[in-house]
């Protein structure tokens, strides 16, 4: 495809939908990934590795045809009522295995904002690489509670084993990259998105996740409002004892 673009004089703009997965997920990753960050562990194979290779190909096109504006959008993990994603599959069952001692920070992107970012990039013709993600984060523990699921903390090896068992009961198995993201999370800096590309998502991470829960009609195992009420009472008791 890029070879055909290179030979076509009429091509003036190429937009590549890439992914935040090129940064990987690792416990020693930076708190926030910028466009200049790289994975702490080499990406050996799979979708993240393929995405990074494709980014290299399109940059090569830009070097050979400097008259073409090449824009790379690294989208945060998307979510929404119509999306089948690692997170939606992870929350499919009533019990959600989590890595003992870890609470991943998740930055999401609503499916409608993903389309909005692609539209903005197409109209703006701004070359460069841009992180595309919503404001704010949601902790994995929050996501489990807000979807009415029950967390099942297990050692890291146990998550993969339990997920394989879930596959046998018709829930999709998660690959290694997805399990690492669900264990450690990933957050991107989106300054360039706002200041250079001129795009601002309409949905925050929390709003995007709540829209997914509403749209999927998830039946809570435990009423999320009851859990939040218990948390508020526990905080109030702790504050009284501490005063």
Task: Name what the model sees in each region.
Residues 1-46:
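Conserved Rossmann-fold NAD(P)-dependent oxidoreductase catalytic core, especially the SDR/UDP-sugar
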Residues 38-44, 88-113:
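A conserved pocket-lining segment of Rossmann-fold NAD(P)-dependent short-chain dehydrogenase/reductase
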Residues 115-177, 190, 209-210, 219-233, ...:
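Mid/C-terminal beta-alpha module of Rossmann-like enzyme folds, strongest
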Residues 15-19, 74-76, 133:
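Active-site beta-alpha turn of Rossmann-fold NAD(P)-dependent dehydrogenases/reductases
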Residues 27-72, 77, 98:
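Catalytic helix-loop patch of NAD(P)-dependent Rossmann-fold dehydrogenases
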Residues 52, 65-68, 79-89, 120-131, ...:
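Glycine/proline-rich active-site loop of Rossmann-fold NAD(P)-dependent oxidoreductases
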Residues 72, 102-115, 129, 140, ...:
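Conserved loop-to-helix N-cap of the C-terminal "lid" that shapes the substrate pocket in Rossmann-like
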Residues 22, 78-80, 114:
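Conserved sequence/active-site signature of Rossmann-fold short-chain dehydrogenase/reductase
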């Amino acid at each position: 495809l890029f070879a055909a673009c290179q030979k076509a004089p009429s091509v003036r703009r190429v937009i590549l939908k890439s992914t935040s997965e090129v940064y990987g997920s690792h416990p020693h990753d930076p708190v926030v990934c910028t466009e200049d960050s790289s994975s702490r562990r080499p990406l050996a194979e799979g979708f993240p590795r393929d995405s990074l290779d494709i980014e290299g190909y399109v940059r090569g096109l830009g070097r050979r045809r400097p008259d073409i504006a090449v824009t790379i959008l690294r989208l945060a993990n998307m979510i929404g009522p119509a999306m089948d994603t690692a997170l939606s599959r992870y929350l499919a069952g009533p019990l959600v295995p989590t890595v003992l001692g870890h609470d991943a920070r998740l930055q999401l992107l609503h499916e409608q904002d993903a389309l909005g970012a692609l539209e903005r990039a197409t109209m703006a013709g701004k070359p460069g690489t841009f992180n595309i993600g919503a404001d704010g984060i949601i902790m994995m523990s929050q996501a489990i509670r807000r979807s009415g699921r029950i967390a099942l903390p297990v050692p890291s090896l146990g998550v993969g084993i339990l997920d394989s068992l879930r596959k046998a009961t018709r829930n999709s198995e998660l690959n290694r990259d997805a399990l690492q993201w669900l264990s450690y999370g990933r957050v991107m800096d989106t300054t360039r998105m706002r200041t250079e590309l001129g795009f601002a998502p309409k949905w925050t991470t929390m709003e995007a996740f709540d829209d997914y829960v509403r749209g999927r009609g998830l039946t809570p195992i435990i009423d999320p409002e009851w859990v939040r009420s218990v948390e508020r009472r526990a905080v109030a008791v702790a504050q009284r004892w501490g005063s």
